[in-house]
Amino acid sequence: ISPLQRAYEQGIPVLTTDQYIGDGNYENGSVTFPLSVIASDNYEGGKIACTALIEAIGGEGSLYILTSTANVPSDIARRDGCIEAIDSVEGVTLVGVDYTESSAPIATNQTQAMLEKEPELKAIFGANLFSAQGAAAAIKSAGLEGVVKIASFDAPEQAIIDLRNEVIDMVIAQQPALIGSLAVQYAYDALMGNTADIPAKVNTPFVVITRDNVDTEEAQNAIYKSE
């Protein structure tokens, strides 16, 4: 926070994207000098992902969460949003939450261990890219594609390949292009002295990509493409 605070004190407008600082309430929270935070609502994203997973398994069965660490606010929010979705359905049981340290190989090992412990596992929520990649590798190795449903948070091209190959069943895409374009627009407005209409918080929407809609314009625009 300190470098951003110094920039602000030197008259440089500050906006944050993807992550907030302080408690995220820039109007009357613990940190108020940034003009705006432009980001996805990660709690809602986790809830959306696991609501879709629960529907995919028919509202019954066991669900496993993989996320990076217990210290990253975005991942904590996704985890907790997923847990809310699970708690709202009587037939679904949370069998565990593991932390992958953003390592796909660790996620693979953790998923393999969970499959041994819970052979009837029905669904996995990979709350970040590496967690989902590792889970997908374990499911593919076990020959359980389509049997264990996987929701992947974030939409790189590999996740879409896994989706098409029926290793992953749904991809929860943030919209980084939209986040970036809004940030540039608000930064320009701030430099021009037009700060009155810059919102203190913008939650950009998610796109849930499945095999049914992956080729639509909306889904294609949400995929994180390398070119």
Pin down the residues of each PLM region.
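A residue-level marker of the well-folded mature domains of exported/periplasmic proteins
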Residues: 1-227
